Amino acid sequence: TSLTVSGVQIDPTAVTPADIVGAVTADGVESGMEVIRQIFPKLNMTPGILLAPGWSENALVSAGLQAKTSHINGVFNCVCIVDIDSSTAGATKYDDVKRQKEKQAVTSANCYAVWLYAKVGDVIYAGSAMAAAATEATDANNGDIPNVSPDNKPISISAACLKDGTEVLLDQEQANVVNSFGVATWLNMNGFRLWGNNTACYPGNTDPKDRWFSVRRFFCWDDNTFIQTYFQKVSDPLNKRLI
């Protein structure tokens, strides 16, 4: 007995940064990141984290993600997680991260930048994908309230690596240097963990409400929740209780 299976496999190499960023045609057809606008009207849900694993190390894509975190549908905000390029054209050493971050123009308070990919066995994952999963798992363990940072939370990976799979061994001192650039990374301290709580606006902006990833995420969530909760009061007469 034999079984033959056929199908069509999507070729990810055919996707370009321009496809990810997207556009609005003259006929009003939206594509790429422009579709983010459709999330709330279609699902009545607000975006929480924007990411484009495998593409966000491109400056055009990372700029687009940062821009799309603010004023979604004119009122909502969220965060994005981007990768700092760790290919041969990017940062292959920890002290190159600052230069590469600046090259990609990653500076938003709503952006969490991650340097290094992650290995699980022989499979390589973009750092942004793993960081987003760790962030959502942290939220789930906290009643879906995003006030706890994913920083220093254990994650089940077997190695930190460059984009080509070359393993990178960072100690805490080196990982802290990466953090000082406003970039998170992976640290093996009795098991791998996400290491870094600064948003990409750091060190240029040290305001706690902008600098700390957990604070930035909570403010976005709280603002979005407030808007949805009290939208029903729009056009109602003002009274002391409502104030």
Where do the protein language model's features map onto the residues?
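Small-residue-rich
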Residues: T1-V97
